């Protein structure tokens, strides 16, 4: 039986090992010497190509792959720069402390008591010497040459760095007692001058731009954008749109009961369901209302957001709808009839006056023996009856000028040329008392805290008024 000879390949020696043995004998293979000496084709390309191209600092070559000094920087980024303004602490001059030589016979106890250093204050303040004012010395001379005086001015400035600081004492605490006196005579009024304030409006042009303080109250109003092209217009007839709009979107749901209709309403629809009103289908938000005026009407408007589709991320996509309901129409002014005022010398009468089929009536108390018959008509007619035959006549009576209802001329009342006497209203007067409060356990009566009541105005028209002469 023949055994097969082993064909194991023997590893060739490295180029460095071959170069050591074959260089002296001259038997080196042709690829060993250029590889060891760095004279291959690639080395020659780098050697001659580096003369035209400079790659300094990039670490390209046969060195380590560290990227040079600054390292590798990602493309498209800026390498970090070091801060240039680094605060440098000023050098502190340290005085050298001389060393004391300790001998073998010196004491082993070191004294820890330091000598007290005295810092002298600054230069003393020079006080100029003032000569005594006992009299003047007058020197006379016959020489007419003007005298030349040597005048020297001395100014002294105190430097707070070299002067002793002044001692500041805390203020004395104030004390008060619990007794005080309130009296009307101690109250005095001051006459202050009222200066009218003007608002300055700065006008500018397109060339010169001037900045000025904004005028208060001139904030621009934000447009609602109710009638834009991307907003759907829907007219609502149901009156529940103004009081409880949630009933038009969802059926009876306790979660939406008690919501304020004047705020923005949010709705959540988990599944597909029909709304009570088809116009409010898929509404997820109904914004707060707004009153607008358009084409002679007062309009109640609300903007709603629909959710017709939604993405996986939860974003809702839908239309923007403008729901509106016209409240009333703005008509022209109503023609009013003036009331005549005559003297009060007429007897007790009764007038039945009607405007637009009896909107208000004026009656007088019956305190005579005659029976009065009145009826509503379009003109002022008076019917008076007695035991004899009556004669119809038109009579105008004056209105009462009591204390509570003063009669004054206005846009709806026309007086005759007779003079009107102003009625003097009685004003109650009384003694003025002084309140003296002494002590710390008192309280004022609640009536002193009440403010002055504002006088209520009584309407003179479109109401039943009782007239007495």
Swiss-Prot record:
<keyword id="KW-0945">Host-virus interaction</keyword>
<dbReference type="GO" id="GO:0042025">
    <property type="term" value="C:host cell nucleus"/>
</dbReference>
<comment type="function">
    <text>Minor protein of the capsid that localizes along the inner surface of the virion, within the central cavities beneath the L1 pentamers. Plays a role in capsid stabilization through interaction with the major capsid protein L1. Once the virion enters the host cell, L2 escorts the genomic DNA into the nucleus by promoting escape from the endosomal compartments and traffic through the host Golgi network.</text>
</comment>
<dbReference type="GO" id="GO:0019028">
    <property type="term" value="C:viral capsid"/>
</dbReference>
<keyword id="KW-1177">Microtubular inwards viral transport</keyword>
<feature type="short sequence motif" description="Nuclear localization signal">
    <location>
        <begin position="1"/>
        <end position="13"/>
    </location>
</feature>
<dbReference type="Pfam" id="PF00513">
    <property type="entry name" value="Late_protein_L2"/>
</dbReference>
<dbReference type="GO" id="GO:0003677">
    <property type="term" value="F:DNA binding"/>
</dbReference>
<keyword id="KW-0426">Late protein</keyword>
<comment type="similarity">
    <text>Belongs to the papillomaviridae L2 protein family.</text>
</comment>
<dbReference type="GO" id="GO:0005198">
    <property type="term" value="F:structural molecule activity"/>
</dbReference>
<keyword id="KW-1039">Host endosome</keyword>
<protein>
    <recommendedName>
        <fullName>Minor capsid protein L2</fullName>
    </recommendedName>
</protein>
<keyword id="KW-1048">Host nucleus</keyword>
<keyword id="KW-1160">Virus entry into host cell</keyword>
<dbReference type="GO" id="GO:0075732">
    <property type="term" value="P:viral penetration into host nucleus"/>
</dbReference>
<keyword id="KW-1015">Disulfide bond</keyword>
<feature type="short sequence motif" description="Nuclear localization signal">
    <location>
        <begin position="450"/>
        <end position="458"/>
    </location>
</feature>
<keyword id="KW-0946">Virion</keyword>
<keyword id="KW-1040">Host Golgi apparatus</keyword>
<dbReference type="GO" id="GO:0046718">
    <property type="term" value="P:symbiont entry into host cell"/>
</dbReference>
<keyword id="KW-0597">Phosphoprotein</keyword>
<dbReference type="GO" id="GO:0044174">
    <property type="term" value="C:host cell endosome"/>
</dbReference>
<keyword id="KW-0238">DNA-binding</keyword>
<feature type="disulfide bond">
    <location>
        <begin position="22"/>
        <end position="28"/>
    </location>
</feature>
<keyword id="KW-0167">Capsid protein</keyword>
<keyword id="KW-1176">Cytoplasmic inwards viral transport</keyword>
<dbReference type="InterPro" id="IPR000784">
    <property type="entry name" value="Late_L2"/>
</dbReference>
<dbReference type="GO" id="GO:0043657">
    <property type="term" value="C:host cell"/>
</dbReference>
<comment type="subunit">
    <text>Interacts with major capsid protein L1. Interacts with E2; this interaction inhibits E2 transcriptional activity but not the DNA replication function E2. Interacts with host GADD45GIP1. Interacts with host HSPA8; this interaction is required for L2 nuclear translocation. Interacts with host importins KPNB2 and KPNB3. Forms a complex with importin alpha2-beta1 heterodimers via interaction with the importin alpha2 adapter. Interacts with host DYNLT1; this interaction is essential for virus intracellular transport during entry.</text>
</comment>
<keyword id="KW-1163">Viral penetration into host nucleus</keyword>
<dbReference type="GO" id="GO:0044177">
    <property type="term" value="C:host cell Golgi apparatus"/>
</dbReference>
<dbReference type="GO" id="GO:0075521">
    <property type="term" value="P:microtubule-dependent intracellular transport of viral material towards nucleus"/>
</dbReference>
């Amino acid at each position: 039986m023949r055994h097969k000879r082993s064909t194991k390949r023997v590893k060739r020696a490295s180029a460095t090992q071959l170069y050591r043995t074959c260089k002296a004998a001259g038997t080196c293979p042709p690829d060993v010497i250029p590889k060891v000496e760095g004279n291959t084709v690639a080395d020659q390309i780098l050697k001659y190509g580096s003369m035209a191209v400079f790659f300094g600092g990039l670490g390209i070559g046969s060195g380590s792959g560290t990227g040079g000094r600054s390292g590798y920087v990602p493309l498209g980024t800026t390498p970090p720069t070091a801060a240039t303004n680094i605060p440098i602490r000023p050098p502190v001059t340290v005085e050298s402390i001389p060393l004391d030589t300790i001998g073998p016979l010196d004491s082993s106890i070191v004294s820890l008591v330091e000598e007290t250093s005295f810092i002298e204050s600054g230069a003393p303040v020079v006080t100029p010497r003032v000569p005594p004012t006992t009299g003047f010395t007058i020197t006379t001379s016959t020489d007419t040459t003007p005298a030349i005086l040597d005048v020297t001015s001395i100014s002294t400035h105190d430097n707070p760095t070299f002067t002793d600081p002044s001692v500041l004492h805390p203020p004395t605490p104030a004390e008060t007692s619990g007794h005080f006196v309130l009296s009307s005579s101690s109250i005095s009024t001051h006459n202050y001058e009222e200066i009218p304030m003007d608002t300055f409006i700065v006008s500018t042009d397109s060339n010169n731009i001037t900045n000025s303080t904004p005028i208060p109250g001139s904030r621009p109003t934000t447009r609602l954008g109710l009638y834009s092209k991307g907003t759907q217009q829907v007219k609502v007839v149901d009156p529940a749109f103004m009081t409880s709009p949630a009933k038009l979107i969802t059926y009876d749901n306790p979660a939406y009961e008690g919501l304020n209709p004047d705020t923005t309403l949010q709705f959540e629809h988990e599944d597909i369901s029909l709304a009570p009103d088809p116009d409010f289908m898929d509404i997820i938000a109904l914004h707060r209302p707004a009153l607008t005026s358009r084409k002679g009407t007062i309009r109640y408007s609300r903007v709603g957001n629909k959710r017709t589709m939604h993405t996986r991320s939860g974003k809702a996509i839908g239309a923007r709808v403008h729901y509106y309901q016209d409240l009333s129409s703005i008509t022209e002014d109503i023609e009013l009839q003036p009331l005549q005022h005559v003297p009060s010398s007429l007897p007790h009468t009764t007038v039945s006056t009607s405007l637009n089929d009896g909107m208000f009536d004026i009656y007088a108390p019956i305190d005579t023996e005659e029976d009065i018959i009145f009826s509503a008509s379009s003109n002022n007619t008076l019917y008076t009856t007695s035991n004899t035959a009556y004669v119809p006549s038109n009579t105008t009576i004056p209105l009462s000028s009591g204390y509570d209802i003063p009669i004054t001329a206005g846009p709806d009342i026309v007086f005759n040329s007779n003079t009107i006497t102003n009625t003097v209203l009685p004003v109650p007067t009384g003694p003025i008392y002084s309140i003296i409060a002494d002590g710390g356990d008192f309280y004022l009566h609640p009536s002193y805290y009440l403010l002055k009541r504002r006088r209520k105005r009584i309407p003179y028209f479109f109401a039943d008024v009782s007239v007495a002469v």
